[in-house]
Amino acid sequence: MANISEISGDSNDGGDPNKKPEEQVLRRSRRIATRNENQNKKPKEEEEKDNRSVSFPIPNELTEACVALIRKCDYPSLSSVSSYFFNLIASSELYETRSRLGLSETFLYAAIRFPDTNPPNWYILHRNKVSSLRLSKLESLPPVPYGCSVVTIGQEMYVIGGLLDVRRLQLMTLIDCRTHKCRSLPKMKRGRYHAAAGVFDGKIYVIGGFRMRKPDAEWIEVFDLKKQIWESLPGPYPKTSMDSQFFAHAVMEDKLYILGSRCLIYEPKRNGEWDATVNANPIWNLWKVPCTMQCVIDDMLYTIDPQCTLGHPIVVYNPKDKTWRPVKGESLRTLPSYFVSDGSEMANFGGKLVILGSNGSCYDTGDCIGEKGIWCVMIELEKREGGEIWGKVESLDCVLGDINFLSVWLCQTLTL
């Protein structure tokens, strides 16, 4: 960005009435080129200092405070104005300011597959100019590999493994959710598909993802975020299961809960112990195939029970007392079927429960109303005496409409 003084007319170029216009333009162009050439010869540190002072003369602290007040959905437009704003929006200091001012926002990232596309693409759930929730495609991000595992750390998502054609990927990709740019990280030693993953003490643990577990396989790999290297853990591995492709996984109370044909509980902070009583744990009573959608809110596992075993379609598991409870509420009893069946996805949206579901199949039976597409229900949760959890539908919106037979593959949320 140039100062006003640099844009004003030059009396030496434009003040001689005897010169032809072509000569004036040519002479000014030469002067500008010479000036730019001289500027390019400055030391890098001096050039960067000049650019900072010229690009935006307002103090950085004041600019940062002003930008923090702007909604995150407007940041992409602002970042395209100049490199100064792009770097500001990509900085961790800006989001620390937003958090300090109580302006942090929760964003949901979903992998959405269209009938004629393969594989799914990344979409972000946000509020538009009129405060309606909408899903918008993130054009800058690559497609989402089938069967990948995703973990979130701060303002970043890590996409691990997956399937390309019939090949299991060793890749791990980091997505910076501030700028929606991505980069590749060091590869795993083994390709993985439908692996379990969790973050503990600055390390990403990845378990399984093979067709079958073998004694000499790197069944567990650990990525050190600080050193940026992968290491294999030799074991001991649980003797109760030879599974290596999992349906779902969740982290609660520093434990990694893994759902397969048999179920596992892994504790990295206790020297990699496996829970020996896992098959007697009541968590497997309602968290099971085929409806494996789940999310963790306040260290409790929420999932769907299509059979309404406890009288309600949404249930919650508390690992402290190892009990299942229904999420009660009259408005939850009347949720459309596509929210409480296999094919939907749920996530922790800033302490609220959000479920995405496609109503395309309902139109075939004629029992669906509203616009066809992907719908989002936002449920406010309330803890009551006796450990009861109650839910109330806060909003119900079509967030990606006029398209039939969309499918939701996964959901992740971050606070920015």
Curated annotation (Swiss-Prot):
Signal peptide: none annotated. SUPFAM superfamilies: Kelch motif (SSF117281). InterPro entries: F-box/kelch-repeat_ARATH, Kelch-typ_b-propeller, Kelch_1. Keywords: Kelch repeat, Repeat. Residues 1-55 are annotated as: Disordered. Residues 1-11 have a biased composition (Polar residues). Gene3D superfamilies: Kelch-type beta propeller. Residues 16-26, 38-52 have a biased composition (Basic and acidic residues). It holds the Pfam family Kelch_FKB95. It comes from the Eukaryota. Kelch repeats lie at residues 156-202, 203-250, 255-293, 294-344. This is Kelch repeat-containing protein At1g19460.
